[in-house]
Amino acid sequence: NQQDQLRHLSINQFIRPDLSWMLNDDIKVSKKVIFIPGASKSGEYKKWSSDKFAQVAKYLVLRKYEIYLTGSNLDLNTINEIIQLCPESINKINESKIEDFYQLCMTSELILTNDTGPAHIAGLTNKNVIWIANDNDISRSCYPLGDNVHKITSSNVKNISVDIIINKIEQILK
């Protein structure tokens, strides 16, 4: 991770960024789960399928959770696919700007994410984050920081089953 990389440069003190300046005073945690189902343009190989995200969304909706889908306009097709399969999911692309996204994460109980940039911001909230990633040198060396980041990896992210994610969710939200 980043701390190990800094140690190789003989930098032994690491200060976790304080993002509290991004918050407004109205932080009310509710039964919502944030999904980050996208990845960068060149990161298609990092994406867990829309179908699997939708299956997890259905599971959570049955347990009375709201599902907020976040990302950029590049993720609109993915988000629409999830909404088509789980219409109760809520498109929050317009609240995915960095200054809104951190606040949104702080009001959630859980964040489910691919290996993508916003996952690192989500990790800094110290909320429970399930990070779905390929098991390779890059993801092993650069994963989200945070005390509650739960890494689920496979040699190919597409091989990670819905059951594995649901089992982890059950452990976290019990």
Regions found by a protein language model. Give the residues of each.
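Catalytic machinery of carbohydrate-active enzymes
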Residues: N1-K174
